[in-house]
């Protein structure tokens, strides 16, 4: 077996499959594009779903890739085991309706065992297979595999929901008896026992059925096109080929671990307690790549995942004695390890470091808040006479504040409290079940559509035409091909068309189809790409249409022009964002409609009003600069040399279109555009908002809609000016400010009057002092205008030694407001109010010294006041 670096393994994999006629699919962005079922790209096949479900036919049915992936449903196991990772690299080879079982197995065995390639010893390889899949068993035998090395496993059948499914055969490497201390042998495989002896290095999925959850597996229908989907973990291959005990001792992780040794002053011991080193090395890889791909830490979705990873890594850094910010210092090492195939980490190093460091600094403040929350929980336990910290509270510390259970346990036990481990495990399992359910839900490939996949007739989109005559070559009605149609809705393919199919954020053209008499026979309401790339026109049929007949196709020119204004403005906006807020502001989605444009981009905070003003100004300057717009067809490399930006998530063929707007913007784009920037007329941003962690959205309008937006603003300003009696529009702001200042003065005067009234009333309230359980207390109903007055009472009470506890109740409108304040450690205001509030059909809470509640039953106020003594 050859001893290869991880980079050599990856390259040899790709080279082998290229020698078998495969095209190399570049690694896709970790943030899924147009796939709401996935939080992350989590496998090599995840980016190829459109090929497997038949919605798109690839140029080459043989594909290979090395795909960066993230899975986070078992984060807590990372660092504890030899092979759990959040980010990993999946090597794959795929056949879309081309070769099948025989070639997949034969070529896989060749790659693994040939001296020209990996040169694995054949006697160290074991294969599992689905018991009913005798064809795979026989093919392995034909390759020279001993029958004793073939293990039938009932679970070797791959299916996730509806869509492509089939048996799979897995390949394992035997590391020998040293990793099997109990000498269990092949039972480890046959009974699926977790072990370190037999390492799964490759899984070959034979996708031959359309799974249907409504019928038994034996009744699944054969796919119209059988597929091969395989996955081999680079980290596992590297561990085996480099003789490493775990994946972490390979060249993918050890350089990071060495840097952590320098930062901590601790030494990594492969046989000792090294969990913290592993966690940090794993998590900083995931963070570096995910942030580089546009995801940012936040409180929801993938942003929450990144925040959790970073906080877990920071806490493990503290366990190693690293108390300052340090993770960001590891980003260059991650980039250097992966540079040969993933240069983007080093290219975006400054931005990634900035985000990681800022998040570390934020977490340092969060740790203080978490410690305060734990202190509050322990104080509450003491007040309630309890000795165990509940599992749900431990989980909240873990989930919300990033506190490892070990830290919570240590601090709680130092204060002589026990830990509810079972309750914590239950809360953790509930979260994991939700996560796994979401993963399963999102895994379906979708059913193949044989009718659409069967369209092979050629069709060409004419960029320069808004009307042309073309021959109708395909009609599909009710999901069946037909020669003619006279009513209802149908899908049409023409030899040539002026209708743009929705793509790259630009909506489809609308229009009409006319016969040779000039009569409209169909209305085009949508155009999408067929699996083989042809524009597929969705039409409402008004009169007879037949295959082989010529028709005149006319787009709605006014709609197209409006869409082109917005699309061209989108390119200008993208460039302006780069110039104003930074090159990290890359496209994360766009929509160019007739009435508006919508542009999503990566950014870690709201765009300020001043920045929006600069962006809007810059876009309009380019419109007024009368810039010529040109399109050029070339190859991807030449386009990039021209400075063209490749848009987020798009896949490009051998020939690409470059859209250049003067010297200001150069992008790869397949859409339609204006001839000159001045045709846009005017550009106005109408909204900027966050749509998720690290993603912002700008909605803007152009041309007539931009003019109307400005006119609406002017009308609103005129109305405001009239309301505040400003003599001219320019005076409106000053008049509004003057009114605001006057209102503030009146409000201040009102507060002062209320405080004086409350102070006067307090004299009577504070006279009625009672005592119970050795605690002096005041309990009274007061007549106030709002809940704020209750707090004013409490502030006055705190300034003098009237009593230890104050309870005030007020009926305000239809609501009952309750306040409890305490000066003594013997009475916890927050706990006390939880006992009182239900009496008036309310609830509330608060801190040890002050708490408030709201209720709805004013008839029970006297009962509440009478219950104060027993609730002390």
Swiss-Prot record:
<keyword id="KW-0067">ATP-binding</keyword>
<feature type="binding site">
    <location>
        <position position="567"/>
    </location>
    <ligand>
        <name>Zn(2+)</name>
    </ligand>
</feature>
<dbReference type="GO" id="GO:0005829">
    <property type="term" value="C:cytosol"/>
</dbReference>
<keyword id="KW-0648">Protein biosynthesis</keyword>
<feature type="binding site">
    <location>
        <position position="669"/>
    </location>
    <ligand>
        <name>Zn(2+)</name>
    </ligand>
</feature>
<feature type="binding site">
    <location>
        <position position="571"/>
    </location>
    <ligand>
        <name>Zn(2+)</name>
    </ligand>
</feature>
<keyword id="KW-0963">Cytoplasm</keyword>
<keyword id="KW-0694">RNA-binding</keyword>
<dbReference type="Pfam" id="PF02272">
    <property type="entry name" value="DHHA1"/>
</dbReference>
<dbReference type="InterPro" id="IPR003156">
    <property type="entry name" value="DHHA1_dom"/>
</dbReference>
<feature type="binding site">
    <location>
        <position position="673"/>
    </location>
    <ligand>
        <name>Zn(2+)</name>
    </ligand>
</feature>
<dbReference type="InterPro" id="IPR018163">
    <property type="entry name" value="Thr/Ala-tRNA-synth_IIc_edit"/>
</dbReference>
<dbReference type="GO" id="GO:0002161">
    <property type="term" value="F:aminoacyl-tRNA deacylase activity"/>
</dbReference>
<dbReference type="GO" id="GO:0005524">
    <property type="term" value="F:ATP binding"/>
</dbReference>
<dbReference type="GO" id="GO:0000049">
    <property type="term" value="F:tRNA binding"/>
</dbReference>
<keyword id="KW-0030">Aminoacyl-tRNA synthetase</keyword>
<protein>
    <recommendedName>
        <fullName>Alanine--tRNA ligase</fullName>
        <ecNumber>6.1.1.7</ecNumber>
    </recommendedName>
</protein>
<dbReference type="InterPro" id="IPR018162">
    <property type="entry name" value="Ala-tRNA-ligase_IIc_anticod-bd"/>
</dbReference>
<dbReference type="GO" id="GO:0004813">
    <property type="term" value="F:alanine-tRNA ligase activity"/>
</dbReference>
<keyword id="KW-0820">tRNA-binding</keyword>
<keyword id="KW-0862">Zinc</keyword>
<dbReference type="Pfam" id="PF01411">
    <property type="entry name" value="tRNA-synt_2c"/>
</dbReference>
<comment type="similarity">
    <text>Belongs to the class-II aminoacyl-tRNA synthetase family.</text>
</comment>
<dbReference type="GO" id="GO:0008270">
    <property type="term" value="F:zinc ion binding"/>
</dbReference>
<dbReference type="InterPro" id="IPR012947">
    <property type="entry name" value="tRNA_SAD"/>
</dbReference>
<dbReference type="InterPro" id="IPR050058">
    <property type="entry name" value="Ala-tRNA_ligase"/>
</dbReference>
<keyword id="KW-0479">Metal-binding</keyword>
<dbReference type="GO" id="GO:0016740">
    <property type="term" value="F:transferase activity"/>
</dbReference>
<dbReference type="InterPro" id="IPR045864">
    <property type="entry name" value="aa-tRNA-synth_II/BPL/LPL"/>
</dbReference>
<keyword id="KW-0547">Nucleotide-binding</keyword>
<dbReference type="GO" id="GO:0006419">
    <property type="term" value="P:alanyl-tRNA aminoacylation"/>
</dbReference>
<dbReference type="InterPro" id="IPR018164">
    <property type="entry name" value="Ala-tRNA-synth_IIc_N"/>
</dbReference>
<comment type="function">
    <text>Catalyzes the attachment of alanine to tRNA(Ala) in a two-step reaction: alanine is first activated by ATP to form Ala-AMP and then transferred to the acceptor end of tRNA(Ala). Also edits incorrectly charged Ser-tRNA(Ala) and Gly-tRNA(Ala) via its editing domain.</text>
</comment>
<keyword id="KW-0436">Ligase</keyword>
<dbReference type="InterPro" id="IPR002318">
    <property type="entry name" value="Ala-tRNA-lgiase_IIc"/>
</dbReference>
<dbReference type="GO" id="GO:0140096">
    <property type="term" value="F:catalytic activity, acting on a protein"/>
</dbReference>
<dbReference type="InterPro" id="IPR009000">
    <property type="entry name" value="Transl_B-barrel_sf"/>
</dbReference>
<dbReference type="Pfam" id="PF07973">
    <property type="entry name" value="tRNA_SAD"/>
</dbReference>
<dbReference type="InterPro" id="IPR023033">
    <property type="entry name" value="Ala_tRNA_ligase_euk/bac"/>
</dbReference>
<dbReference type="InterPro" id="IPR018165">
    <property type="entry name" value="Ala-tRNA-synth_IIc_core"/>
</dbReference>
